[in-house]
A protein has these predicted regions:
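A generic secondary-structure signal
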Residues: 276, 347-350, 387, 420
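N-terminal accessory segment at the very beginning of proteins
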Residues: 31-292, 324-327, 331, 338-340, ...
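Catalytic domains of carbohydrate-active enzymes, especially glycoside hydrolases
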Residues: 340-361
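Bacterial N-terminal signal peptides
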Residues: 16-27
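Bacterial N-terminal signal peptides that target proteins for export
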Residues: 3-16
Length: 438
């Protein structure tokens, strides 16, 4: 990695993908590879569509069982006055959580809120499900669904085609209004408004423009609703790109499992989403300040008239190979201070630039120490951490590799997340490229 000009600091790198944890919690790691209990390969070869409705029955205070004329069943389960779940498995599977490998969960332990009254009525060819904040109309002849906000009288969701159960995916088709806009889908690099676009709900392990780094099967609409597909499987959301005024949602699953939430505005809809999945991480105070990422335990610096100007008035050129120059280190203890991570902290301070956090190993093969043991390297990292904290800066690491020690790996590239956090005081993780999603 290229390093900054020490005096001007004009080459500070911007951060686009980090995970800040204080303290770090390994229980919040999102599963990157998962599969549902019903394998897609077991899905029917031919496509199936939802048919007309025979009847609907309230089976408990929050749940309605819908029976179609082809004997397929759909469950509508309310998780609050304005949040409901639509589940349909034509192979006969019961309502369940999606399977994840490694094990993970999407919903919080207590995702439900009180539903004061759920009524089911049938009139003029429609079955109507009503709470204080949602009205669902099911067309008995077509099986199509409309969802209304009774507080405004507005139709916020309208199916325009039956749900399609294909051999490899399930597809939902909704109406798009001309003035309707869509936001969400997780980290869609460089994209936040999706009208007229197709977005991928999958980890593409990409951190460049247009890639997907950390997807979420959730979006919200300015029409007054949000949607979360309850799955870990890959998906694709088409917001009028293929067909104008049509939204097509699909996931590589053999069954349908969607949460809909009806509310007005981004804040309310996001709070509904948080009711199901939990509140987002609140960044620590230092996380709102600038961060600095680079490698300070790998490269050599040799005098070169075309190199970078340093404080001693000389110019140096950087090399990852031993070019006979001075090798850098975290703490500048080898007569190499100006090439150290400590020097970076001091430069920010000398230029009156607030620095919140520093990652000293952000480069392939860098590591964070030059001793023969992992414990020795962690002690070296702790020394930097102590110095950084005295100057109001927290330290972190690029994950790069596994989080725990492995036999046969050199001390330079060994990791021990427990000791890094507990002993060295690491408070930041950058998780791109390796480990997460790799």
């Amino acid at each position: 990695m290229k390093k900054e000009t020490p005096i001007s600091l004009r080459h500070l790198r911007r951060i686009t993908a980090i995970l800040l944890l204080c303290p770090i919690s390994l229980s919040s790691i999102q599963a990157s590879v998962a599969s549902d209990q019903s394998d897609v390969s077991s899905a029917p070869v031919c496509q199936e569509q939802t048919s007309g409705i025979l009847r609907a029955e309230k089976i408990n205070p929050t749940t309605v069982d819908v029976l179609f004329t082809n004997q397929q069943r759909m469950t509508i389960d309310f998780y609050g006055e304005n949040i409901f779940r639509v589940f349909q498995d034509n192979s006969g599977g019961v309502i369940r959580d999606p399977e994840a490998k490694p094990e993970a969960q999407i919903l919080v332990d207590q995702p439900r809120r009180k539903v004061s009254g759920l009524s089911v009525d049938e009139k003029d060819g429609y079955i109507t499900l009503t709470t204080a904040q949602v009205r669902i109309e099911l067309n008995k002849q077509t099986g199509l669904m409309k969802v209304f906000n009774p507080l405004t009288g507005k139709c916020v969701i309208e199916e325009v085609a039956p749900v399609v159960f294909g051999p490899k995916e399930v597809t939902v088709t909704l109406k798009e209004n001309p003035e309707e806009y869509f936001y969400g889908g997780g980290v869609q690099n460089g994209r936040f408004s999706h009208k007229g676009k197709v977005i991928a709900i999958e980890n593409q392990n990409s951190w460049t423009d247009g890639g997907v780094a950390s997807p979420a099967p959730f979006y919200w609409s300015t029409n007054g609703y949000g949607m979360m597909w309850y799955t870990f499987r890959k998906g694709e959301y088409d917001f009028g790109a293929t067909e104008k005024n049509i939204v097509k949602l699909s996931h590589n699953s053999s069954y349908l499992d969607i949460f809909y939430m009806v509310n007005d505005g981004a804040v309310s809809l996001l709070n509904d989403f948080y009711q199901l999945t939990g509140n987002p991480v609140l960044l620590p105070k230092f996380g709102f300040y600038e961060g600095h990422l680079n490698a300070y335990n790998r490269d050599y610096w040799k005098e070169d008239e075309k190199g970078i100007l340093f404080e001693d008035g000389k110019r140096y050129k950087e090399s990852q190979k031993d070019n006979g120059g001075i090798k850098e280190s975290l703490n500048g203890e080898k007569n190499n201070y100006q090439f150290s991570a400590r020097a970076v902290i001091d430069r920010y301070k000398n230029h009156d630039m607030p620095l919140g956090w520093l990652l000293p190993n952000d480069g392939y093969g860098a590591g964070y120490g030059q001793t023969e043991t992992l414990d020795g390297n962690i002690a070296n990292l702790k020394s930097l951490g102590d110095y950084a904290r005295k100057n109001g800066v927290e330290i972190g690491l690029w994950t790069q590799s596994d989080l725990h020690p492995k036999e046969g790996v050199s001390a330079l590239l060994q990791r021990d997340i427990v000791k890094e956090v507990r002993d060295a005081g690491v408070r930041v993780l950058k998780t791109d490229v390796a480990w997460v999603g790799a």
